[in-house]
Structures are given as structure tokens and as C-alpha cells.
Amino acid sequence: MNKLRSVLPGILLFAVFTVFTALMCYVDVQPVGMASTGLGFATLNTDVNRALGSNETIYKITEILGYLTWCVVALFGLLGLYQLIRRKSLLKVDRDIIVLGIGYAVMLAFYVLFDKFPLNYRPPYPWNEGELEASYPSSHTLMLVFVMATAVMQISHRITKKTLRLLLSIACIAIAAVVTAGRLLAGVHWFTDIIGGILLAAALAALYYGIAWGKKDRTENTAAE
């Protein structure tokens, strides 16, 4: 029961993402995408896209910030490798690091899945040469939100200095927020692409927290009481 309670928020968020994704396939689907491809919630998406327009500068900024995702992934990968070499056993590597590696793999699996079987394609924007690119969910949003959310969790558990912990956490949250908003403002994703990316990332992050620390945190809270 305790294990289920730990992962329940993540399961519920994933259920919301699944329902939202299903609705994308049936609600207000119109051939308004690039090359007249279908798009769910078409009226909402096209209204938002027309209102915001496109901005190549913002797009380039989000692309640059997107590389930070892989820097963070590499950092925790190196931490896991260091522990493995130092402790000479995979079983002795911190549980939260092992689960984080699995989380990264699951995140990439979802990226590949939606790239190979796209639900819709990106909206037309001036610097696109007509190439059809999978758009749902926004991969930048998915990766930045998940990686930065789990980074904040790692920071809160590994860094003892409050000021440094706060500054690093704010930086992670700010980067994720800027990229998420930037992908929409740049005009390279539909509104529902962003929502889908946030929902999936939040579900994976909640599942990660529940598996890596949920039971431990509840035990500590009970002991404190």
C-alpha cells in the first residue's frame, strides 16, 4: 500500500496525459497542419498560434538552452559512474541515481515513440523549409521539464548549503520555464504540444520521486512526529 501511495501522483498524472492524448485524436481534428495534416483541438491551436506568431530569435535561444539538458544528464551519469567505480558494485550505487538513469531512458523511449508515430506535425513557420516534423508532445518541453525537475530533487537531497541549493533550484526552474514558454512563443509548436509535454514530464518526474524517495521521506516524517 505504501509503495502504491508513493507512485500514485505519477500514475494519476500519466492517466491525465493518456486521456489528453486520446482527445487529441478525436476532438476538433482539422487538416490545418503543415501539408494539410490533421490537428486535434484545431480551433484552439490555430487561434493561439496566430495570436503569438513566430520568432526565430526565441527559437534559437530555446535551442541553446536545450543543450543544457544533456549537460545535466551527463553530470548525473558521471556521478553514477564515479560511484560504480569507487564502490565496485552496481548494487552499491545510490538508488536515486539508478532510478534516475532509468527515468532518462524512459523519457528517451517516449521521445522515440512519438517521433516514429507522430500524432501531429509542427505548425508552419518562416525558417522551416517545408519538412514535416513530429510535434506532439514538445520534446524540448518533455526533456527540459523532466530533467530540471529531477535535478531540483537531486539538489534538495545532495546539497546542504541553503543558499546554493536555492540558487541552483531557481536556475533549473527558470531554464525549464523559459524553454517551455519559448517553444510556444517561437511558433514552432502548437499549444497542445506544450501541454502534452508538461503533463508527460510531470508524470515521469512524480513517478521518479515516488520510486526514488517516496517511502524514505514518509518514514523520516513519521519518525520526526
What are these regions (language model features)?
Residues 3-7, 60, 64, 89, ...:
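Hydrophobic, aromatic-rich alpha-helical transmembrane segments
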Residues 1-73, 116-128:
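N-terminal transmembrane-helix/juxtamembrane module of multi-pass inner/ER membrane proteins
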Residues 16, 68, 72-78, 102, ...:
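Lipid-exposed faces of alpha-helical membrane segments in multi-pass integral membrane proteins
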Residues 8-19, 98-113, 117, 146, ...:
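Hydrophobic, lipid-facing residues on alpha-helical transmembrane segments of integral membrane proteins
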Residues 32-34, 84-166:
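Membrane-interface loops
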Residues 1, 86-95, 219-225:
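Membrane-interfacial, low-structure loops and terminal tails that flank and connect transmembrane helices
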Residues 76-86:
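Long, hydrophobic/aromatic-enriched structural stretches that serve as scaffold segments
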Residues 4-10, 24-25, 127-225:
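Membrane-embedded catalytic cores of phosphoryl/pyrophosphoryl-handling enzymes
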